[in-house]
Amino acid sequence: MKIKSLFILLFLSVFTFAHAQLTDYSIFDKKFNFYVANDLGRNGYYDQKPIAELMGTMGEEIGPEFVLATGDVHHFDGVRSVNDPLWMTNYELIYSHPELMIDWFPVLGNHEYRGN
């Protein structure tokens, strides 16, 4: 009996979800683009500069609103504060394309905690 009840509940859940799906896609006419990347802070090593240039070139086409840097934004010993010189050498001098002069939102990973 439990299996039958579970099956009916599952069927009703799927049916309700399938019926409630979006059908008017015009709300997606306005595009919203952004970058999500991680392991960016390599102080110029590991092809960081060519990748940054490619991000800028792609940005000319897609027009990203912001960059979400998801962890490990400062290898190898983290940063001490928002005024740490690594922000300049890891980001400002590397990601210098005009299309990358947008908001950056770094998410701290395990490498950031070493310096602070």
Which ranges hold each PLM region?
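Boundary at the C-terminal end of the N-terminal hydrophobic targeting segment
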Residues: A18-A20
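Membrane/wall-proximal cationic-aromatic binding patches
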Residues: T23
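N-terminal secretory signal peptides that target proteins for export/translocation
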Residues: M1-K2
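Active-site neighborhood of divalent metal-dependent phosphoester/pyrophosphate hydrolases
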Residues: I27-I51, G56-N116
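Sec-dependent N-terminal signal peptides
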Residues: S5-V14
